[in-house]
Amino acid sequence: MSQRVEQLKEFHHWTKLAQEQTGKSPVTQLKEILALRKMGGQCGISDYYNYKLYDDSYLKGRGREDFLGWKLHTQFSLALNPRSAVLPAWDKNVFTLIAGSAGLPVAPVMACFHPAAQISPILGQHLRSIEDVQKFLRNPDIYPLFGKPVYSQQSYGSASLTGYDDQCDSIVLVNGGKETIFEFSRRMVESVDTRYHKPECGYIFQKSLDLAPSLQAFTKWSAICGVRVVCLNGPQGVVPIQAMWKVAVAPNHVDNFSSGRRGNLIANVDLKTGEVSRMVDKYWPDTQVFESHPVTGVPLAGLRLPDWERVLEICHLGGALFPLMKIHHWDFALTAQGPLILELNDIGGIAQLFGGGLLTENTREFLKCHANLQEHPWVKAL
């Protein structure tokens, strides 16, 4: 009962903010929410407010009709990506082996913990045991370093390591904290979160990457700020449909948006030019479009992601490499050495914060042609 009361309070709060932002009365908002049921995307109350569907001036394309409700976010990708084809999007070692062997620019791996008797040289130094990992981490020459599980979601188990303190046998984290070698190495064999992290798949260490100078001048922080590019991958080739820049804010060592809970930022990216706009820090209506970085104060106007044409070229090359996955969610690091692929994702859900929905007319037709209609009958109603 208390949860229901809190939910109603939140809806009332959203209604009030939407009215302040647009002048729309609660009655008008309710009518628009009810009308969403006929649009095929299964949007509901939270979608209406979180994606700013209450503000006609903010919306692009066909407006509310183009939006996909949260109930279908996962189903959207499941309908297009057969489960038999998505292992490279879940296992970072599998992806690195396939993409690296094909010549795609993947972030290089320095070392990999894995209990297998032998692994590919592409995965760097083979760390077969916890003792091997601990010995590796006690070498001061390897830092700075970034570590992450081979199988994990939302960056659980990852860490940005800046050095080794032999006085307390600890690694030094990018935020200034410390963790003993013993405690850190436990994540090699123990899950940090059983929902997202599968330690049996291994753990990789990568040399820390340098953020592209133009982007570091904006963030004034060392953490990599990745760009997510969503692409449809059909017989006629790859079609990028949305892109967004994920901005890590100090002291965070990763750029995950996490619905705004971590304090990071996310911004729209123009697919043709790579120009960045409409930067926010939360879901609507509890956010605003920032004209400058809220921490550094650097203006956003005119900022373009470097090497944007190369990013799109890599997306096209990757489409041919993973043809059975009909939707790709690519994550790139934009570094001082150029764009590097961080990972390919199977499922994504942060692409509709900037006024444009995923369910455009072209995307609907693509779904009808390539989705598994037997397992996903909702596609037929589009």
PLM-predicted stretches and their roles:
Residues 92-224:
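Active-site nucleotide/adenylate-binding loops and adjacent lid/helix of ATP-dependent enzymes
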Residues 113, 149-151, 165, 207-210, ...:
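Short, flexible loop/turn elements at secondary-structure junctions
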Residues 179-192, 218-313:
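ATP-dependent carboxylate/phosphate-activation module, predominantly the ATP-grasp catalytic core
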Residues 285-327, 334-382:
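C-terminal active-site "lid" helix and adjoining low-complexity regulatory extension at the edge
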Residues 142-144, 200-202, 224-228, 240, ...:
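Extracellular structured ligand-interaction cores
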Residues 8-142, 151-153, 315:
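Conserved N-proximal alpha/beta basic substrate-recognition cap immediately N-terminal to
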Residues 153, 162-167, 233-237, 271-273, ...:
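Short acidic-glycine loop/turn motifs at beta-strand connectors
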